[in-house]
Regions:
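N-terminal carbohydrate-binding accessory modules
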Residues: 32-79, 91, 106, 110, ...
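Aromatic- and acidic-residue-enriched carbohydrate-binding clefts of CAZyme catalytic domains
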Residues: 43-49, 74, 83, 92-95, ...
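The substrate-binding groove and active-site-proximal loops of carbohydrate-active enzymes
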Residues: 50-60, 83-99, 132-150, 172-179, ...
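Short, acidic/polar
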Residues: 59-74, 149-155, 275-286, 353-361, ...
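Aromatic-lined substrate-binding rim segments of carbohydrate-active enzymes
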Residues: 66-135, 157, 246-260
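Polysaccharide-binding and catalytic clefts of secreted carbohydrate-active enzymes
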Residues: 137-155, 159-313, 321
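Hydrophobic targeting/anchoring helices
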Residues: 266-269, 273-462, 548, 552-566, ...
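A conserved amphipathic helix/loop scaffold
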Residues: 496-722
Length: 722
């Protein structure tokens, strides 16, 4: 059943005003910090860069290093990422030797390449006898480790801060800290609890095991084994681990900044298709620590649960999640698998070909990335990834992958205008509900075999898939952005499986709709707060906003269709909605409300009483997709660059720059004919990859191009003003 989903009085101008007001609200100190950060970034992000990790093997020589950097320069790379492994430079206590890394920096300078230096301050050397090998993160809460780490940072940053080849400092590779229950970590946890609760009495009103003092806290994983569990201590511990990682990163950043105020800082979180909060990662919090954000996106490892035909979809998901957390600042794809995986990739061994590399790279550039760095240039000679993932061949000669990358580097050099363009701002966002993603770690345990703990994540991904396949530009927004009112810049906000939301978030949603936003939700929206305390009705505290609610839940063992189309829309639950002013959009086969719409204030709220987005993730049904995307399509109608016709196998991106607009299409399916429109009167549109002029038509204020798109191909259209 179709309905007019565009909210009453919808106005892009209003959203622009919201953005302006948010910018004006930034404090003078924050503005000064942003200006300093922008100055550090400018020399590095003034162009779109390609790069690769250079791994310093112990068999390397000064001459072999120089040869590799000459090849990198020849094939268009301007960034070389390097791990400055602590054990490499301090094999014995206080015996520091960096001469082999000097080879790298000097070779980079000769080849006009910037070094992205990865610090390893959390990864102590072998002589300390704390780890069995490198890449084993240790506890940065330990003051003894921090003391040695500070010396390591001073030796590295102090040596290279004035080197002409120095680029950004990566504070930590794929940031994560060892989850531990050591005394120093408990001391940090006690201080965190004191900041959260203020008094022990307040904490003791919640925790099962009372404390005399915050400093007495001691937890262990045995407290949260399956069965009856103290939810309060579990959620506090999980939130602490997120903040504890941020504190460790912040400490490293402070050590770097005390030595070097010139070069930017960077990090590359990983696992973007996984439950990040459950693993101790908050992209938005980590992004705030550094000058610019990046991520590791390895299809070979990250997409093992997906079909290769959907790799483009999930690569796009990672890009949009990364871009959203980066905000208005530049961002990179800091690791992208560049070569064969034989043993290291588990169930997905592969070797990306020319067309795959092209689609990944152009989709990243179309999404707004200022750089893509491959993992890696040259193969390791020993270890878990020995002989794998490299761009060059095993003997060090350029492979067909290197040649393919050079073609793209040459195209970027011919298209300086692309570096001046920015991705078109989405009008649609999905709430990345950290609180639901944490709470499900407890709620989902009892049915682990059914992977219940994955449901909020899969619903989030299902929402993205439904929208991306309809070529709707998408942002993600987090809980804190929601609470500050930043979500008001979006016409439509999606809440997939957001069954846990704190009281402030619920109130922020109310304000979002009251001020003119369209809120779309499904399932047990806001049923619980962040600790798992249930609210008496669903949607929790928002019945007047949605114009319907319920106090009962009917679990559904198997998917159930509500229409004659056999769409299997009902998933997990059927909610007996009680109408309180809402308009019924869809009724089930028994005539009961299945989906409702309600005007509240200047906006509207749409609600489906089942886990609709989870069902779409699992079955990719067209009718279910339509129910999800209708409000987004209405909001997307006036976008300046649109894919008017094209299948869901196309990843579509739009950018605008001075006097130009770009459309980037990456086809992960069969050959087809596509139609792209540019709002306004453009003098010509060219295929930016071939230089060929496109035939134009004009209709209702748009410049329209119809063009064939080959299977597994990339099309970049550049529209030029007169």
């Amino acid at each position: 059943m179709a309905c007019n989903y565009l909210r009453p009085g919808a106005s892009f101008g209003l959203n622009l005003l919201v953005v302006v007001l948010l910018v004006l609200a930034v404090s003078p100190r924050a503005q000064a910090q942003q200006a300093e950060s922008a100055a550090r970034l400018a020399p590095l992000t003034d162009q779109i860069r390609l790069g690769a990790e250079y791994f310093l093997n112990r068999t390397d020589t000064a001459e072999s290093v120089r040869h590799h950097f000459q090849l990198m320069h020849k094939y268009g790379l301007t960034i070389a990422r390097v791990f400055i492994i602590w054990d490499d430079i301090e094999r014995e206590r206080d015996q520091w030797d960096l001469h082999r890394y000097d080879w790298i920096y000097d070779a980079a300078q000769e080849s006009d390449i910037k070094i992205a230096a990865t610090l390893c301050a959390e990864d102590p050397p072998g002589w300390m006898k704390l780890t069995p090998f490198y890449h084993h993160r240790m506890n940065l809460n330990d003051p003894k480790l921090r003391e040695r780490s500070a010396i390591y940072i001073e030796k590295v940053v102090g040596r290279y801060r004035n080197h002409p080849a120095q680029g950004p400092w990566l504070l930590m590779n794929e940031p994560a800290l060892q989850v531990n229950y050591e005394r120093t970590t408990m001391e940090a946890f006690g201080k965190w609890l004191q900041e959260r609760y203020g008094s022990v009495d307040r904490l003791n009103q919640r925790w099962f095991q009372p404390l005399q003092n915050f400093s007495d806290v001691q937890v262990s994983p045995e407290q949260w084994i399956p069965g009856w569990t103290d939810y309060y201590s579990f959620i506090d511990w999980k939130e602490f681990n997120i903040d504890n990682l941020c504190d460790g990163l912040r400490w490293i950043e402070q050590q770097v900044r005390a030595l070097d105020t010139t070069h930017p800082t960077h990090i590359n979180p990983s696992g973007l298709t996984h439950n990040l909060p459950a693993a101790g990662t908050d992209l938005w919090k980590e992004s705030a620590i550094v000058d610019f954000l990046g991520a590791s996106i390895h299809p070979q490892w990250l997409f093992s649960e997906f079909e290769p035909s959907d790799f483009g979809l999930w690569f796009a998901y990672c890009l949009d999640l990364l871009r959203s957390a980066a905000g208005t600042r530049p961002w990179w794809v800091t690791e992208l698998g560049g070569g064969p995986t034989i043993y290291s990739a588990g169930v997905r061994p592969m070797n990306p070909g020319k067309s795959e590399l092209a689609r990944w790279l152009w989709d990243a550039f179309g999404a707004g990335a200022r750089g893509v760095v491959f993992w890696l240039w040259n193969p390791r000679v020993l270890g878990n990834e020995a002989g794998e993932v490299a761009l060059v061949s095993l003997d060090g000669d350029p492979s067909p992958r290197v040649v393919a990358v050079k073609e793209i580097a040459d195209t970027l050099n011919r298209l300086p205008e692309l570096a001046q363009a920015k991705a078109v701002a989405p009008r649609v966002a999905i709430l990345y509900d950290r609180e639901a993603l944490l709470l499900i770690g407890l709620d989902g345990r009892a049915q682990a075999a059914a992977k219940r703990a994955q449901e909020p994540l899969w619903s989030l991904e299902g929402t993205f898939a439904a929208l991306h396949r309809m070529h709707v530009p998408i942002d993600f927004t987090d809980i804190q952005e929601l609470k500050t009112g930043a979500a008001q810049r979006y016409d439509v906000l999606y809440l997939p499986y957001s069954y846990a939301l704190d009281d402030q978030a619920v109130q922020a949603l109310r304000e979002y709709v009251r001020k003119g936003g369209t809120l779309w939700a499904d399932g047990l929206a806001a049923w619980k707060n962040e600790y798992g305390e249930v609210r008496p009705r669903i949607p929790g505290g928002l019945g007047d906003v949605f114009g319907a609610d319920t106090s009962d839940i009917y679990p559904v063992e198997k998917p159930y269709s509500v229409t004659a189309a056999n769409e299997q829309a009902e998933e997990l639950w059927r909610l007996p909605l009680e109408l309180k002013g809402a308009q019924v959009l869809v009724r089930d086969r028994e005539g009961q409300p299945f989906a409702v719409r309600h005007q509240y204030g200047k906006g509207q709220a749409i609600y489906f009483g089942t886990a609709l987005t989870l069902g779409y993730f699992r079955r990719n049904n067209g009718q279910v997709q339509k129910w999800i995307v209708e409000p987004a399509l209405a909001a997307n109608a006036g976008m300046p660059v649109k894919l008017e016709k094209g299948s869901g196998q196309i990843s579509f991106r739009a950018l605008e720059g001075p006097g130009r607009a770009f459309a980037v299409l990456s086809n992960w399916g069969q050959a087809e004919t596509v139609v792209v429109s540019f709002t306004g009167d453009y003098a010509k549109v060219v295929n930016a990859l071939s230089g060929a002029a496109m035939k134009l038509t004009r209709a209702t204020g748009k410049t329209v191009v119809t063009v064939p798109l080959q299977a597994d191909a990339v099309l970049v259209l550049e529209a030029q003003k007169p």
